Swiss-Prot record:
It holds the Pfam family Cry1Ac_D5. The keyword Amino-acid biosynthesis does not apply. It comes from Bacillus thuringiensis subsp. sotto. CDD domains: delta_endotoxin_C. Promotes colloidosmotic lysis by binding to the midgut epithelial cells of many lepidopteran larvae. Gene3D superfamilies: Galactose-binding domain-like (2.60.120.260), Pesticidal crystal protein, central domain (2.100.10.10), Pesticidal crystal protein, N-terminal domain (1.20.190.10). Belongs to the delta endotoxin family. Toxic segment of the protein is located in the N-terminus. SUPFAM superfamilies: delta-Endotoxin (insectocide), middle domain (SSF51096), delta-Endotoxin (insectocide), N-terminal domain (SSF56849), Galactose-binding domain-like (SSF49785). One of its GO terms (molecular function) is toxin activity. GO terms for biological process: sporulation resulting in formation of a cellular spore; symbiont-mediated killing of host cell. Keywords: Plasmid, Sporulation, Toxin, Virulence. PANTHER family: ENDOTOXIN_N DOMAIN-CONTAINING PROTEIN-RELATED, PESTICIDAL CRYSTAL PROTEIN N-TERMINAL DOMAIN-CONTAINING PROTEIN. The gene is cry1Aa. This is Pesticidal crystal protein Cry1Aa.
């Protein structure tokens, strides 16, 4: 910027940034976890993982209920206290935090019980435990939530009220979905479902009511008041209204499968000005008028920024927005010019790239300019420059800079929803619009301040309709409004604005894009409120689809509340004819002057059942639990090779039509798990490609051992060992683990899966033999004994047919001195290794043996792997065993040497020389027999 001699004062901008956030080299570095961060993560979770099951339960634990302590809950209270300038009394504060702590502790117990039950859902004790835990959790929440609505503190307690309400609805949904499997009777389940639907409305209306009360409370006439008003609106949209907008999805009978919602509401960062929070009297209303009125959602394509100059200072003087409707890229339309089209520099074009603009770094400029002697001072409040950063899930995209990059970071007030990835991928909002606060007061001051509007990233651009989920599309994503239809402010719980009609006619047209096969059939549902009975008509590309009569939901003049809206549908399914289609909704057969409000439409796959969704969720959970972390770096130690094969079966049995992409992704993860399992397995040829193939490596065994391909029990090869008629010649299978593969002072584990066995002896030998005899009845098949193993169309085992539940957490290890339980198909045997010596190459011998006529065994998925380093008594014990073995070996060597020496002397005495080619003259047959006995 050019220097100007008329400058008298230059005040650096105080960005009022969050002290827990710094901007370093363009990257946002988090040093704290605020209520807004938590709420954004929760909203992301609810938008992406809204499926009942242990995954959802444990997700709530991970995000909030398992990590929060008193200080984190207090931060939620402090956030609103500061906004409304009201302190919660110490008693009410302590009571609220204590209740939240109690709920957190109780829910962690509930979540663990849920996890255990889901792993073994037919276990009577676990079913009873779930009934107990649900009743305790439901009772605690029913008692606690009214305490978060304490008189005079409803607003400052609002965000924790919503967190508790969300938890309560999730628990009630659990019993609605799983209650029968837990053992509750139908009457109890229906009663709890009725509680769920009633409380969805109650909790929603309460939250919206007190949000509006708080918002009205912080309104005032000056810019300082507007800043607080806008902050309250923005932050409680994130911590309260966004979560409440998803409450209706907890209705498990209306949304039995994965449901995708979208938040189309906008939030606003403050006009980027120096001294904005306190320098402008009576301007709050003027600033609020700068906020965009309710409108259809559009896609921001370009911002053309103009530059003006005032006494040597260049600044953002105006801009023009070019956008397009949702659903397709054209035709574009331009908004009227905001501000004025200055020509002090060429216009700067900011074009949409990647997933949109997720961040702005702005540089406000304030100058007090002395025009001469006397009081003729003029103040300049403008924007000197902005950097626009573009979102991308994969790569860093170059930003666009208007003049210069600043320090006022939009991420400080609208942070990412996922801090585990770069902000460009974890962003929560994208820039949706820019208006201009413009004011001039003659020779007193000049003000030009762009105001940025932001939309949640869940509001996608294309109105995509897949086959595998219920798709909710807000009607504000329509392409065109019918004549007489208007966009009005939403009631607060719809996640955005809504449409309104007061006379019969077309409501809107919506362009949708179908990613499913065109043969996929759907049913349409409409969420509406109306003061009159009416008839809805739907059509696709001008082709009539559905027509139905529906009733009034509210009285004329009533406020819109949760109960005012009803979700209704048509029974006749249909399919789309084109991948890109226009859906039209109309309302007819009612008198003008009535009010009809439309929130959203829903496309429900006609054939999708909850079972398919449950299978996917179960498979995802099973795959994720194979690994030690979410990045799949390592396998959990207790995950067996057999377990991985069973998880692979779960994935292979998923529906291609319902979740092909997810199935392919899970399949790759299972293959990775299998590779990790092979890498840690010290056995050679664990999948039995052959026996006696090589003399010095791999498996050696009896000639009557057979290798068989996978069946309904084993996914891969397994071996069958038969009995023997001669105990001196047992059936055997063995392999030696080379010394070079072993670590000193480490415990190793042999484990595998036995389909059935009788008199199977298992040995691990190093310093001595570890030995177990295992008898497993022939019920190892996943199939009921009364049924024949299912066969696929090509003769292969059908692993996707209904089968008995398999419990991956069954503990059936054989420890020192123990016998395996007779019904444990999983076995494991430990052995401790002391000092290693490559010269001795002692190794570990793995041996399976049957020495009875009735003996037999079928086994596979064998593993020999490192378990843990030896410490303490185990270390001392192996050292004693090693010393005892060495002492015994040395004694045997000493005794052997003596015997050898005596024998050699006896033999030497028989011959005349060391070549042993001629006997002594006196050597006789008795002397030879005596030497032979040596």
């Amino acid at each position: 910027m050019d220097n100007n001699p008329n400058i008298n004062e230059c005040i650096p901008y105080n960005c009022l940034s969050n002290p827990e956030v710094e901007v370093l080299g363009g990257e946002r570095i988090e040093t704290g976890y605020t209520p807004i961060d938590i709420s954004l993560s929760l909203t992301q979770f609810l938008l992406s993982e809204f499926v009942p099951g242990a995954g959802f339960v444990l997700g709530l634990v991970d995000i909030i209920w398992g990590i929060f302590g008193p200080s984190q809950w207090d931060a939620f209270l402090v956030q609103i206290e500061q906004l409304i300038n009201q302190r919660i009394e110490e008693f009410a504060r302590n009571q609220a935090i204590s209740r939240l702590e109690g709920l957190s502790n109780l829910y962690q117990i509930y979540a663990e019980s849920f996890r255990e039950w889901e792993a073994d859902p037919t276990n009577p004790a676990l079913r009873e435990e779930m009934r107990i835990q649900f009743n305790d959790m439901n009772s605690a929440l029913t008692t606690a939530i009214p305490l978060f609505a304490v008189q005079n503190y409803q607003v400052p307690l609002l965000s924790v009220y919503v967190q508790a309400a969300n938890l309560h609805l999730s628990v009630l949904r659990d019993v609605s979905v799983f209650g029968q499997r837990w053992g509750f009777d139908a009457a109890t389940i229906n009663s709890r479902y009725n509680d769920l639907t009633r409380l969805i409305g109650n909790y929603t209306d309460y939250a919206v009511r007190w949000y509006n009360t708080g918002l009205e409370r912080v309104w005032g006439p000056d810019s300082r008041d507007w800043v607080r008003y806008n902050q309250f609106r923005r932050e409680l949209t994130l911590t309260v209204l966004d979560i409440v907008a998803l409450f209706s999805n907890y209705d498990s009978r209306r949304y039995p499968i994965r449901t995708v919602s979208q938040l189309t509401r906008e939030i606003y960062t403050n006009p980027v000005l120096e001294n904005f929070d306190g320098s402008f009297r009576g301007m709050a209303q003027r600033i609020e008028q700068n906020i965009r009125q309710p409108h259809l959602m559009d896609i921001l394509n370009r911002i053309t920024i103009y530059t003006d100059v005032h006494r040597g200072f260049n600044y953002w003087s105006g801009h023009q927005i070019t956008a397009s409707p949702v659903g397709f890229s054209g035709p574009e339309f331009a908004f009227p010019l905001f501000g004025n089209a200055g020509n002090a520099a060429p216009p700067v074009l900011v074009s949409l790239t990647g997933l949109g603009i997720f961040r702005t770094l702005s540089s406000p400029l304030y100058r007090r300019i002395i025009l001469g002697s006397g009081p003729n001072n003029q103040e300049l409040f403008v924007l000197d420059g902005t950097e626009f950063s573009f979102a991308s899930l994969t790569t860093n995209l170059p930003s666009t800079i208007y003049r210069q990059r600043g320090t006022v970071d939009s991420l400080d007030v609208i942070p990412p929803q996922d801090n585990s990835v770069p902000p460009r991928a974890g962003f929560s909002h994208r820039l949706s619009h820019v208006t201009m606060l413009s004011q001039a007061a003659g020779a007193v001051y000049t003000l030009r301040a762009p105001t940025f509007s932001w939309q949640h990233r869940s509001a996608e651009f294309n109105n995509i309709i897949p086959s595998s989920q219920i798709t909710q599309i807000p009607l504000t994503k329509s392409t065109n409004l019918g004549s007489g239809t208007s966009v009005v402010k939403g009631p607060g719980f719809t996640g955005g604005d809504i449409l309104r009609r007061t006379s019969p006619g077309q409501i809107s047209t919506l362009r949708v894009n179908i990613t499913a096969p065109l043969s996929q059939r759907y049913r349409v549902r409409i969420r509406y409120a109306s003061t009159t009975n009416l008839q809805f008509h739907t059509s696709i590309d001008g082709r009539p689809i559905n027509q139905g009569n529906f009733s009034a939901t509210m009285s004329s003049g009533s406020n819109l509340q949760s109960g005012s809206f009803r979700t209704v549908g048509f029974t006749t399914p249909f399919n789309f004819s084109n991948g890109s289609s226009v859906f039209t909704l109309s309302a007819h057969v009612f008198n003008s002057g009535n009010e009809v409000y439309i929130d959203r439409i829903e496309f429900v796959p006609a054939e999708v059942t909850f079972e398919a969704e449950y299978d996917l969720e179960r498979a995802q959970k099973a795959v994720n639990e194979l690994f030690t972390s979410s990045n799949q770096i390592g396998l959990k130690t207790d995950v067996t090779d057999y377990h991985i094969d069973q998880v692979s079966n779960l994935v292979e049995c998923l529906s291609d039509e319902f979740c092909l992409d997810e199935k392919q992704e899970l399949s790759e993860k299972v293959k990775h798990a299998k590779r990790l399992s092979d890498e840690r397995n010290l056995l050679q040829d664990p999948n039995f490609r052959g026996i006696n193939r090589q003399l010095d490596r791999g498996w050696r065994g009896s000639t009557d051992i057979t290798i068989q391909g996978g069946d309904d029990v084993f996914k891969e090869n397994y071996v069958t060992l038969l009995g023997t008629f001669d105990e001196c010649y047992p059936t055997y299978l063995y392999q030696k683990i080379d010394e070079s593969k072993l670590k000193a002072y480490t415990r190793y584990q042999l484990r595998g899966y036995i389909e059935d066995s009788q008199d199977l002896e298992i040995y691990l030998i190093r310093y001595n033999a570890k030995h177990e005899t295992v008898n497993v009845p022939g019920t190892g098949s996943l199939w009921p004994l009364s049924a024949q193993s299912p066969i696929g169309k090509c003769g292969e085992p059908n692993r996707c047919a209904p089968h008995l539940e398999w419990n991956p957490d069954l503990d059936c290890s054989c420890r020192d001195g123990e016998k395996c339980a007779h019904h444990s198909h999983h076995f494991s045997l430990d052995i401790d290794v002391g000092c290693t010596d490559l010269n001795e190459d002692l190794g570990v011998w793995v041996i399976f043996k049957i020495k009875t006529q009735d003996g037999h065994a079928r086994l596979g998925n064998l593993e020999f792997l490192e378990e843990k380093p030896l410490v303490g008594e185990a270390l001392a014990r192996v050292k004693r065993a090693e010393k005892k073995w060495r002492d015994k070996r040395e004694k045997l060597e000493w005794e052997t040497n003596i015997v050898y020496k005596e024998a050699k002397e006896s033999v030497d005495a028989l011959f005349v020389n060391s070549q042993y080619d001629r006997l002594q003259a006196d050597t006789n047959i008795a002397m030879i027999h005596a030497a032979d006995k040596r």
